[in-house]
Amino acid sequence: MDSYKTQWLTSEGDERVRCELLAFGTVEDLERGTLNAQDRNVLVKLSILNYVYGKQVVTFDALLKNYAQAGIELTDNDIEMILLELCNHGIMDVSIDSVAREVKVLQLSRYRDVYCGERELLVVNPTKVITNIEIIDTLQAYSDKL
């Protein structure tokens, strides 16, 4: 199956918006585009990955607040189930402390498409996507530390 980005590059209309949201978006972008229930669930999972990217510890309150701002009500159990599903798929590895209500991010694999300016973004905020320039800068900073 092609990546959402590959589909986005060749699609038009509603399908383009759908693929753009799934390739680069988060739940915060939903107000500018609509998704069916299945795609919305995928975006909820992808949004967790976006939120934890670059963080070592994330609180349940922060995750729940992030979703609430997008009009999506989740429970602690919902968050735990999503995290466990992502771990089972090998996308990430976390340590969940249900009592302290926090998640320690142990490992996060490449998980989202990278925006390289191929087309204009219609619904996703371009300042919030992972770009090729950001990746190059991160690699350069890492290389400089060696």
From Swiss-Prot:
Its main location: cytoplasm. InterPro entries: Csn9_fungi. It is found in: Cytoplasm; Nucleus. Keywords: Cytoplasm, Nucleus, Signalosome. Residues 1-107 form the PCI domain. GO terms for biological process: protein deneddylation. Component of a COP9 signalosome-like (CSN) complex. Component of the COP9 signalosome (CSN) complex that acts as a regulator of the ubiquitin (Ubl) conjugation pathway by mediating the deneddylation of the cullin subunit of SCF-type E3 ubiquitin-protein ligase complexes. The CSN complex is involved in the regulation of the mating pheromone response. This is COP9 signalosome complex subunit 9. The gene is CSN9.
